[in-house]
Amino acid sequence: MLDANKLQQAVDQAYTQFHSLNGGQNADYIPFLANVPGQLAAVAIVTSDGNVYSAGDSDYRFALESISKVCTLALALEDVGPQAVQDKVGADPTGLPFNSVIALELHGGKPLSPLVNAGAIATTSLINAENTEQRWQRILHIQQQLAGEQVALSDEVNQSEQTTNFHNRAIAWLLYSAGYLYCDAMEACDVYTRQCSTLINTIELATLGATLAAGGVNPLTHKRVLQADNVPYILAEMMMEGLYGRSGDWAYRVGLPGKSGVGGGILAVVPGVMGIAAFSPPLDEEGNSVRGQKMVASVAKQLGYNVFKG
């Protein structure tokens, strides 16, 4: 049994130590994100048996952004299976920025990872759907099943994203021209943009992690969301590419599958045990929350979790 006092103490200490850490800046290329108050910070644990511990602004709702890629990858694995995802999208780190097109050019137009923009757009196109709205509703539903029913699209975030997503539209057309997109290019880009524009809070984000930690069963609803056999593929991708250019450093220092988003959220999974999540808007140059990384790493270190430890 996990010690409840120790878990609450871990989140309290992480928050106290790092919630006002200086450094980083909000994402400024998406107008909505640029205007989120930079002083906000939160950290939370949800255990695989459904206990919740949090500190800070844990009820504040922020844009899910790239963490949504984890949810869409999970749905694609359910729909088409791990082999098809690997064959049609890939399962390798790019070593390049999350929105780079260079990796596409170097590999004949094939994306390498579902957790960078090109691969995520391709993954969105793999979802079984007869039309745009069905594709979107299925992705929203998997987000809600994994994290909580309150997860919903923000029209304000979506509008802010849709009017600035020219680079992603270009990526979609490159994928389409190379034969690695499996629906209309602009449909894929539209739905991908929507999936990034949902709002979540830190406890719900930790619940998403706890659902993965529990082998695909949401510990708060007790409902199976994913096949247990598909979860290791998700965690492997998170370990390889979840924090973009910081992924290797994260694996080296923290040793947990993780995923960040430019909305300021960051998630880590302790398989079989818990999800750890944090939120704070200022980002490092790779697009990861400066305070969030520190808070999640602090919780993991205090509790002694690292998947590479014996």
Curated annotation (Swiss-Prot):
One of its GO terms (biological process) is glutamine catabolic process. SUPFAM superfamilies: beta-lactamase/transpeptidase-like. The modification N6-acetyllysine is found at residue 294. Substrate binds at residues 66, 117, 161, 168, 192, 244, 262. GO terms for molecular function: glutaminase activity. Keywords: Acetylation, Hydrolase. It catalyses: L-glutamine + H2O = L-glutamate + NH4(+). The keyword Hydrolase applies. Belongs to the glutaminase family. Homotetramer. This is Glutaminase 1. It comes from Escherichia coli O6:H1 (strain CFT073 / ATCC 700928 / UPEC).
